[in-house]
Amino acid sequence: MQKIPSFISRFIQDNHVVNFAAYTIDDFWTASCFYAFDHNMARLILLTSKNTRHSQIMLHNPKIVGTISAQITDIQAIKGIQFSATSQLLTKQDTEYHSSLTHYYQRHPFARLTSSDVWLLHLDMIKYTSNEYLFAQKSIWQRHTE
């Protein structure tokens, strides 16, 4: 696995809401969720019920696309990512379940007040755009080089 560049990781870590779309041949839906970023494994951890429309679609097709963007109004401060990922529903029997949930709770302590299903979004490709130093500067990261 390729390491995500630090400037992209920092951007992902500094934000907390992911927007994504799930699809099958018969249905598609979008969702916005709080996330915790697991830099070492290049994945997002999120809590969402497996009974939601987007989760039901992800159970049939784990491939998703999404965005994370800062909510700013100054065009020179625009930063964001577009990504493709593979979703995975964790069960309590999965070895990563408890560590993923702990990681999420560290980022979002209020989530302890309710129970929900734990999902991993394994980032496969990221396109990062920033206007910070150069207008519309783009950087691409891929989990695996071809």
UniProtKB/Swiss-Prot annotation:
Disulfide bonding pattern of the chain: none
Gene3D superfamilies: Electron Transport, Fmn-binding Protein, Chain A (2.30.110.10)
InterPro entries: Split_barrel_FMN-bd, UPF0306
Family the entry assigns: Belongs to the UPF0306 family.
Name of the molecule in the record: UPF0306 protein HD_1359
Taxonomic placement: Bacteria, Pseudomonadati, Pseudomonadota, Gammaproteobacteria, Pasteurellales
